Amino acid sequence: KSLDKMREEDITMLQPDDDEVFADINEDEFAPYYRNEKQAKIMITTRPRPSKFVFTFIQDLLELFPRCFYYPRKTFSLKQIVEFSEKKNFTHIIVLNEKDKVCNQMIVTHLPYGPTAHYKVTNIVNSCSIAGHGRADLHKPEVVLNNFNTRLGLRVGRLFGSMFSHEPEFRGRQVATFHNQRDFIFVRYHRYMFEEKKARPNKTQIVGEDGKTAVMVATQELGPRFTLKLKWLQAGTFDTKEGEFEWIHKQHEHGKNDRKRFYL
């Protein structure tokens, strides 16, 4: 059996008939984005004095998230950045930290009242390193949020979903996927490609039941590719000293060898 099938029972798992959950999401801070009443505007910044290597990842994120803009951190505090962002009508901030010239942390906050999520970042593959990668265009992508099955997972997934338009432009055939598996969130960006299935030499052309030529669907990865793991979720914006934590990962409480317990 896989670890997914041996997963410990969790009382916070979502149920299809849970009216309380559906009532909550209709009134939460992300609801206006899902009702297309509000569009995200995202700022990306870094730690002070970032290395040049993190800028390749930033460029990829600018193509992944619509209406996303990079601002140099300089010497500003996070509190000053939040105040500036609110004045400029930003709805989200992404802050990237790094170690040994590799991005290793990502903080995502929703303005003006949170929540704020802190992720460990691993396995970054920039677009330029993906064989046969495509280039994203200006069409608004679809967003797929997969396997966020607990109340915490729903909250994390809705935070990601609020960063995208919910009126995707299907003509662009672009899809941003956030797939949760065992509390690791795999982020991918693809384009669908449709091709008529050609007949082999001396063979009859393949047709569907409607008499039309069969069409094959393939995907082209646009990049970037990376993995996130949630470290904590806070109710407000950037206050690790006095802020209220909705959830925090504590290794000694969860158990180092507890491989069957997942939280998203």
Go through each PLM region and give its residues.
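Phospho-regulatory, Ser/Thr- and acidic-rich intrinsically disordered linkers and terminal tails
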Residues: 1-264
